[in-house]
């Protein structure tokens, strides 16, 4: 399953992304972030992290360097 998602993202990068101007505000790009997050954390958590990152990638966000975290911090319940 992991390889399927990575293959789909790479297909997007190869065939769809070149049709648009580069607009990603982050480094690494959102697609590279998604691939790394899925490789490191699996399909569910990695896809969730990539979705949150893509939702932050808009003209009103400053962007910048935002790597995939080494470990995902769990939210503490009070």
UniProtKB/Swiss-Prot annotation:
Compartments reported by the entry: Cell inner membrane
Principal subcellular localisation of the protein: membrane
GO CC aspect terms: plasma membrane
SMART domains (UniProt xref): Haemolytic
Keyword Cell inner membrane: yes
Topology versus the membrane: Peripheral membrane protein
Coiled-coil segments on the chain, per record: none
Biological role: Could be involved in insertion of integral membrane proteins into the membrane.
Protein's recorded name: Putative membrane protein insertion efficiency factor
